[in-house]
């Protein structure tokens, strides 16, 4: 029975993933045609490799249509409802670091914490006749963090289709929840991260589908990759 692995299809995530596999002793033989998104592992005929977008990898792991994959923890938590019941994070891989954060305009000088934001949200409707608008691509993580963790209920999520950090300046939102590596883009757009506004510290992870946990082969591959990370 073959094991299906899904890895990022391009860029530094792909390069770093292949380097992790090589350290674990898995040599991936790439196709000659760049439009071919399948590959094989030298000497491992039962391994089938797919190259997909990081978000598609998270979805397929949730469905159980791939056994192991490399993707960002932020995508796993955002894409999958009840993620821990559907997938398991086997290892953090040490690259692709980024934080999902709550950021507000710098001119909101009195707003530095989520408690301050709760006060603003409650007051916002009375002052402006509408709810506080939050631009984000991370609606699930935003709802969990605001409503469940901090008890903030009076807000509205505005779907972000472009550059989220530009939404407050454009007038389409009052604040944002977005992912950042260095914070430089937020600062360039005169936004600040709240002191307790880090929702998730994300990085690339090796993730397994829960429905594949009966497979010894999947466990063996995950263990070998973890061992390679310690070299």
From Swiss-Prot:
Record-listed E.C. numbers: 2.4.2.17
A GO biological process held by the record: L-histidine biosynthetic process
Compartments where found: Cytoplasm
Disulfide bonds: none
Chief location of this protein within or outside the cell: cytoplasm
Reactions performed catalytically: 1-(5-phospho-beta-D-ribosyl)-ATP + diphosphate = 5-phospho-alpha-D-ribose 1-diphosphate + ATP
Pathway membership, UniProt: Amino-acid biosynthesis; L-histidine biosynthesis; L-histidine from 5-phospho-alpha-D-ribose 1-diphosphate: step 1/9
Domain of life where this protein originates: Bacteria
Matches recorded under InterPro entries: ATP_PRibTrfase_cat, ATP_PRibTrfase_CS, ATP_PRibTrfase_HisG, ATP_PRibTrfase_HisG_short
Cellular compartments per GO CC: cytoplasm
Keywords (A to Z) from UniProt: Amino-acid biosynthesis, ATP-binding, Cytoplasm, Glycosyltransferase, Histidine biosynthesis, Nucleotide-binding, Transferase
Gene Ontology terms, MF aspect: ATP binding; ATP phosphoribosyltransferase activity
Enzyme class: transferase
PROSITE patterns named in the record: ATP_P_PHORIBOSYLTR
Annotated NCBIfam families: hisG (TIGR00070)
Free-text comment on this protein's domains from its UniProt entry: Lacks the C-terminal regulatory region which is replaced by HisZ.
The protein's role, per its UniProt record: Catalyzes the condensation of ATP and 5-phosphoribose 1-diphosphate to form N'-(5'-phosphoribosyl)-ATP (PR-ATP). Has a crucial role in the pathway because the rate of histidine biosynthesis seems to be controlled primarily by regulation of HisG enzymatic activity.
Similarity remark: Belongs to the ATP phosphoribosyltransferase family. Short subfamily.
Subunit structure: Heteromultimer composed of HisG and HisZ subunits.
HAMAP family: HisG_Short
Protein name (record): ATP phosphoribosyltransferase
Lineage: Bacteria, Pseudomonadati, Pseudomonadota, Alphaproteobacteria, Hyphomicrobiales
């Amino acid at each position: 029975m073959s094991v299906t692995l899904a890895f990022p299809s391009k860029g530094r995530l792909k390069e770093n993933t292949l380097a992790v596999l090589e350290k674990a002793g898995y040599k991936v033989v790439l196709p000659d045609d760049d439009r071919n998104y399948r590959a094989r592992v030298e000497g491992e005929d039962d391994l089938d490799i797919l190259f997909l977008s990081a978000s598609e990898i998270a979805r397929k792991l949730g469905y159980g249509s791939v056994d192991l994959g490399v993707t960002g923890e932020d995508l796993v938590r955002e894409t999958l409802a009840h993620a821990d019941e559907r997938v398991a994070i086997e290892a953090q891989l040490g690259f692709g670091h980024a934080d999902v954060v709550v950021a507000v305009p710098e001119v909101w000088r009195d707003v530095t914490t989520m408690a301050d934001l709760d006060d603003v949200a409650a007051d916002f409707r009375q002052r402006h006749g509408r709810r506080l608008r939050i631009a984000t691509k991370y609606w699930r993580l935003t709802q969990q963090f605001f409503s469940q963790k901090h008890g903030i209920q009076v807000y509205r999520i505005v779907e972000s289709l472009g550059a989220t950090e530009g939404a407050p300046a454009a007038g389409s939102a009052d604040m944002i929840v977005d992912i950042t590596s260095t914070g430089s883009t937020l600062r360039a757009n005169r936004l600040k991260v709240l002191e307790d506004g880090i929702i998730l510290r994300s990085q690339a992870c090796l993730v397994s589908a829960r429905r594949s946990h009966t497979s010894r082969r999947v466990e063996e591959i995950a263990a070998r990759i973890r061992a390679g990370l310690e070299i």
